[in-house]
UniProtKB/Swiss-Prot annotation:
E.C. code: 2.1.1.199
Subcellular localization(s) per the UniProt record: Cytoplasm
Keywords assigned by UniProt, alphabetized: Cytoplasm, Methyltransferase, rRNA processing, S-adenosyl-L-methionine, Transferase
Sequence similarity: Belongs to the methyltransferase superfamily. RsmH family.
Biological process terms in GO annotation: rRNA base methylation
HAMAP family: 16SrRNA_methyltr_H
GO cellular component, one term: cytoplasm
Pfam families, alphabetized: Methyltransf_5
Catalytic activity: cytidine(1402) in 16S rRNA + S-adenosyl-L-methionine = N(4)-methylcytidine(1402) in 16S rRNA + S-adenosyl-L-homocysteine + H(+)
Domain of life: Bacteria
Main location (coarse class): cytoplasm
Protein name (database record): Ribosomal RNA small subunit methyltransferase H
Species: Klebsiella pneumoniae subsp. pneumoniae (strain ATCC 700721 / MGH 78578)
Length: 313
């Protein structure tokens, strides 16, 4: 079911500015969503510019297909495969910028039928692409208690992960859960301590969603792929919404900005050092949303934008 959800793109201008758009450049919007970033990129491109957008959500694809612009094309799939999409178009090493807006989008959260939200009752799904893979309900019904506990602790940073996992497994033995409200109620009942400022299901829903969609692996693969597709001087502009995402992006940009680490005292010739390769990226810093943006869109509060540039190495 698709409705007209109001969607405010977080750090819109800042993320696109980070790409340093050239009118004749070739760019990738790896998370089309509802098209906020893509439309702004297109507005800054000239007649020779190109934009390739990617999204694994069929609803996002439906929105993208309404854009009638010869400079624009859309791919239905995960952004982890961006190197493949670029290679198919003979654009490897020619991309001038990649933008990624990570995590779940507001339209996905706000549509109860997608099953992402503990605030709205809907099918316990949580897949960004409902046509592929296991739903959250299917995974929770078949996974071992220890595996569920590990996911909740690792991807939700939830200290009561074992207790919640036990409650989920016990409930599913009695009657399998198929609704988000059922899961939220089981989590709330299992929590020995309540956080006054956070719904008890927040961390567990995040963890299950990340696991079902392989979100962190997707990010890691996309970042690795970016090095092979970016042209020298090409930009990475990446928005994260929680510490697990941002940690991966921060570590990647830092490591690729440092170049190969050679232990002190090991003699190496200039030719050997050159063979190891130089810095792949130059980190250009991070930006956070201003007070005004957070006031208008509270979901922007935790967002972090990191920008890096491909070197000539």
């Amino acid at each position: 079911m698709m409705e007209n959800y109001k969607h405010t793109t977080v750090l819109l201008d800042e993320a696109v500015n980070g790409l340093n758009i050239r009118p004749d450049g070739i760019y990738i919007d790896g998370t089309f969503g509802r098209g906020g970033h893509s439309r702004l990129i297109l507005s800054r491109l000239g007649a020779e510019g190109r934009l390739l957008a990617i999204d694994r959500d069929p609803q996002a694809i439906a929105v993208a297909q309404t854009i009638d612009d010869p400079r624009f094309s859309i791919v239905h799939g995960p952004f982890s495969q961006l190197a493949e999409y670029v290679g198919e178009r003979n654009l490897t090493g020619k991309i001038d910028g990649i933008l990624l807006d990570l995590g779940v989008s507001s339209p996905q959260l706000d549509d109860a039928e997608r099953g992402f939200s503990f605030m709205r009752d809907g099918p316990l799904d949580m897949r960004m692409d409902p046509t592929r893979g296991q739903s959250a309900a299917e995974w929770l019904q078949t996974a071992e208690e220890d595996d569920i506990a590990w996911v909740i602790k690792t991807f939700g940073e939830e200290r009561f992960g074992k207790r919640i996992a036990r409650a989920i497994v016990e409930r599913n033995r009695i009657q399998p859960m198929t609704r988000t409200k059922e899961l939220a109620e089981v989590i709330a009942a299992a929590m020995p301590v309540k956080d006054k400022h956070k719904h008890p299901a927040t961390r567990t829903f995040q963890a299950v969603r990340i696991w079902v969609n392989s979100e962190l692996e997707e990010i890691e693969q996309a970042l690795k792929s970016s090095l092979s597709v970016l042209a020298p001087g090409g930009r990475l502009s990446i928005i994260s919404f929680h510490s697990l995402e941002d940690r991966i992006v921060k570590r990647f940009m830092r490591e690729q900005s440092r170049g190969p680490q050679v232990p002190a005292g090991i003699p190496m010739t200039e030719a050997q050092l050159k063979k190891l390769g130089g810095r792949e990226l130059r980190a250009l810093g991070k930006l956070m949303p201003g007070e005004e943006e957070v006031a208008e869109n509270p979901r922007a509060r935790s967002s972090v934008l990191r920008i890096a540039e491909r070197t000539n190495a």
